[in-house]
Every structure is written in C-alpha cells, then in structure tokens.
Amino acid sequence: MSNSAFNRRWAELLLEALTRHGLRHVCIAPGSRSTPLTIAAAANNKLICHTHFDERGLGHLALGLSKASREPVAVIVTSGTAVANLYPSLIEASLTGERMVFLTADRPPELMDCGANQAIRQNGIFASHPCQTISLPRPTVDIPASWLASVIDHSMANLQHGAVHINCPFAEPLYGNEEPAYDEWQQQLGDWWKSKTPWLSQPVAKVVAEVPDWDCWQQKKGVVLAGRMSAEEGVNVAKWAKALSWPLIGNALSQTGQPLPCADLWLDNPHVQEILAQAQLVVQFGSSLIGKCLLQWQAKCQPQEFWIIDPIPGRLDPANHRGKKLTCHIADWLLAHPAQPCIPWAQSCTLWAEELIVWSEKAVNCVRTELAGKFGEATVAYRLRELLPERGQLFVGNSLIIRLIDTLGQLPAGYPVYSNRGASGIDGLISTAAGVQRATAKPTLAVIGDLSALYDLNSLALLRHPSAPMVLIVVNNNGGQIFSLLPTQEEARQRFYCMPQYVNFDHAAAMFGLKYASPQNWMELQQSIKQAWQQNETTLIELKVPDREGAECLQQLLKQVAML
C-alpha cells in the first residue's frame, strides 16, 4: 500500500480526535504537503471548513472564530514559510487565551537540511509562544492508533489557554488510489469511532482562587478596574461593584457599560487623584487596560493590596503591586465572593463614589461641548453606540481609534465587544473581525484605521459572503496618526512614524465586490449604516477625516479636564 493511503488514515484519526474536544471550525490554506489533513477535514461532517489564500490572514480568521465561539479552532497549512506566517496570530492567542490548534504539514526528516524545496526547520519554530509543541513522527503502521489518539487527547485536555503547535510530517506520495486501505489500523480503536468521547479522558479540575478573609476586605474602600472580559462577565462585575458601592472604572472592552465614562480624561485631574488615593484595595478583573491615564494611575496607586482576577496564568501587573493574582474564571470568582451591601461604612463609600460621578459628568460635558456640530473620528468614537446593530456585536481595531472609543465613548452594558489587545498589533484585524462574525452569525460593526486596513487588505476577501450584515468602517486619517502625539520633529514624525499613504478604499471595495460608501457628515453616516443593516452583505464605509483631528481633539480634552 502507498504512503498516500496511510497518510489519509492517520490524518482522519487526528482530526476525529480533535472533534471529541469541542473543535468544530477548521481554517485551511492551499498547499500540497497538507493534502492528507485537508482532505480528512473536508470529509469529516462534524467540521466546518473555512479557506483563505493568505496564511497570516488565515491564522487571524481562526483567532476571531475562537474568540467569539469560545471553542478551540484548528488551522491547517502546508510546509515552509506558510508556517511562519501564522506567528502573529499564535502570539496573540498566547496573550489573550484563545484556544487554537496549529496543524502544520512538514517534509519528512530525510528531506531536512539537504536543499529540498519548501523544507525549513519547523519543529520549535514558534519558540516559547505555544503552550504546547508536539512533533509527530512520520505516519507508520508500526505506531498504534491508540498512541495518536492519546497524544491528541492529552494535548487538548491541557489546552486551557493559548495555542498548541502540532507539526505533521508526511512523505510522498500524497495522492493516489482513493480506495479504502489500512482500515484495520483505524479499527484498533473499535467502537470509539461510533462514540462522541475522547479515547483518553482527562477531566480538569475547576479551581476557584478564593480569598479566605473576603468578608474583611469588602468592608474597606475599594476601586474596581475592568479590562477585557465577556459580555456576561462585564454585566456581573458591574452589578458586583454597585452592590459594594465601589467605583468601577471600565474600559471599552469590559462590557460593563462604563458607569464612569470618559475615565481617561478625568483620571489625570489632581482632585480625582486625591479621592482615589483613599483606596485601600484595588480589584482588577481582566487584563488589556487601554487608556494611558488609567495605566499611569494603575502603576502609581498604592492600596494595601492590588488583586487581579483573570483566567490566563502568569503575572499581569506591570507595576508589580503587593497583592494577589487570582487565576480563575471571573464568573466563578464572583460567585465565591458575593458582595454584601450592608457594611458599616456604606454611606461614606457611596458619597466617595458619587463625587467621582460628578467628575465623570464634567468630563462628558466637556466632550459634548467640544464635539458639538463636528464630524470626524472623535465624533464617531463619542457617538459609536448610535451606530451599533441591534442584537449585534462590535470589533474594534488598534492604535488611535480604540483609544478614542475608550476615552470618549460609553458602550452599552453587555454588548459584545471584541479586539486584539494582547500584542495590540495592527496586523490581521480585518481577518479577525471576519472570524468573529462567522462564529456568531450576528450583525457586526468593525472599526479600524487606514494603515490597519492596508496591512490586512487581502482579508477583504473573507468579507464577501457574511452570514449577517457586516459594516467595516475604515477611519482614513492618512497614516498612523497616533504618532502625532509623540514629541518628535514634524518632518521626521511624518516620514518615519505616521507614514501617510494618500490612498482611498473605493477601489479596494470594488476589487473584492463589497459595497462602498464615503459619508461626509453624521447624517450621511447614519443613513449608510441604516441601509447596511438591512442586507446580508458587507459594506465598507470610508471616513475621510483630517489627519490630526482625532489626536488633537484628545490632547485638547485632556488639558481641559485636567484644569477643572
């Protein structure tokens, strides 16, 4: 029998074993060496196959699918530099916790380091970024089927956060007789094929990191910080903080409703800092804090203890406060540490929180006055909630736009918000948004900058046939205008940092068959959005705004509120 037949049986078992751990989505790039994996995935009716010709975009598509579905997602690519193109999405998953399985086809050992085409050293290519790295042997009947099933089961049982890299060498021939062969090798697993469970079951204990003296701590003056979390968690954290009468400072990714909006404006005010200096305990839920002023306050605050609750292992406090890193799911921790509203100092705490509400309202009034009658990226950030689709979701890009939304906007509590705020790169944002939309089949609004759109332009191909209406707003401020905030010489800043490209996106939309609009005022933008939500297709809306308007508006508002 040929290698092609057994390669197929090997790959079929590998993919089937993955499905026993809740894996439903597989993202596939074209390539010959990965043929056994591709054909096995396509033949498995438990799997939904997605394709893309660009491996970098493919990895981010899988990232978005995993982000929104909260399930593991597999990626299949051929050998060579196709593997290296997965690096950015793998790094992001390692930082934000999405579970991903990278299946990289490879040349067999005898073709390594001898000049063979498309043969690179793939074992360990991702260094320490995967949580696991598995180098499978060349498929052979001498290895029991139970060994392969057990390896996959063990890996998936321990895949709680981040990515696993499984390198899969296949020898030629990769194509050949399609007649069934080597069935006896697969049948070593008996009736497992008819079941729905793993060959090797390894239940993982669900542990909640409890604080034994919580009853004592909740009687102190606390501040709650809310970073990246799920919509359900955001709502529950907001309720928990309210019951304790503790002020909640939530960023745009917290989905808490940001009860104290415009925090990054008023946090820099000296009066506010005097109030917050009274905090005896700071509790941070989730990572990925966004605002510069919030990060500065978080770094210099000096409570008795600083706690971080996040399911991702590791240190998540750059300021290295004294306190606790509680590694567990936020929902589980809240259940184990309920808020008791009847506490001795509740009245004084309420007054303390109310004073922060006043400062938040002052900041909102400054924003309202500054943006009255204006149309630009700052206005879009401030009024973004008016553009959100009903029962939909939001994907926010990086760089200046997410800072503006975080600083000026107030998103609804429990409204799903997604982003790539692990490494916070501008690569793969369109493809990640495409994955988020495919995972949920919800109307989706994505907002990114012009350089981000150029960086992932290939992935507009992924938006051609959405399962629900999708709007991609490209804020075209002619370059990386977040660098306008840098204290550098103007000519050097434009050449080496902002890098204006002087492009329009109408031709890009046309090339990929997407609808296009370029509204000139708020009313036209609302009308374009309203029309887009009525059709199951993608509309690219380009907002051509003055280069520095957003950055200058942010600087002006920071100065205004700091001087109140």
Curated annotation (Swiss-Prot):
GO BP terms in the entry: menaquinone biosynthetic process
Cofactor(s) in the UniProt record: Mg(2+); Mn(2+); thiamine diphosphate
Q: What class of enzyme is it?
A: transferase
Details of cofactor binding: Binds 1 thiamine pyrophosphate per subunit.
Q: Which residues form a coiled coil?
A: none
Annotated keywords? Magnesium, Manganese, Menaquinone biosynthesis, Metal-binding, Thiamine pyrophosphate, Transferase
Pfam families associated with the record: TPP_enzyme_C, TPP_enzyme_M_2, TPP_enzyme_N
Q: Which InterPro entries match?
A: MenaQ_synth_MenD, MenD_middle, THDP-binding, Thiamin_PyroP_enz_TPP-bd_dom, TPP_enzyme_TPP-bd
Q: Which residues form the signal peptide?
A: none
Q: Which reaction does it catalyse?
A: isochorismate + 2-oxoglutarate + H(+) = 5-enolpyruvoyl-6-hydroxy-2-succinyl-cyclohex-3-ene-1-carboxylate + CO2
Q: Where does this protein act, in terms of pathway?
A: Quinol/quinone metabolism; 1,4-dihydroxy-2-naphthoate biosynthesis; 1,4-dihydroxy-2-naphthoate from chorismate: step 2/7; Quinol/quinone metabolism; menaquinone biosynthesis
E.C. no: 2.2.1.9
Gene Ontology MF: a single term: thiamine pyrophosphate binding
Question: Its function?
Answer: Catalyzes the thiamine diphosphate-dependent decarboxylation of 2-oxoglutarate and the subsequent addition of the resulting succinic semialdehyde-thiamine pyrophosphate anion to isochorismate to yield 2-succinyl-5-enolpyruvyl-6-hydroxy-3-cyclohexene-1-carboxylate (SEPHCHC).
Q: How does it assemble?
A: Homodimer.
Q: Which family does it belong to?
A: Belongs to the TPP enzyme family. MenD subfamily.
- Name of this chain's protein: 2-succinyl-5-enolpyruvyl-6-hydroxy-3-cyclohexene-1-carboxylate synthase
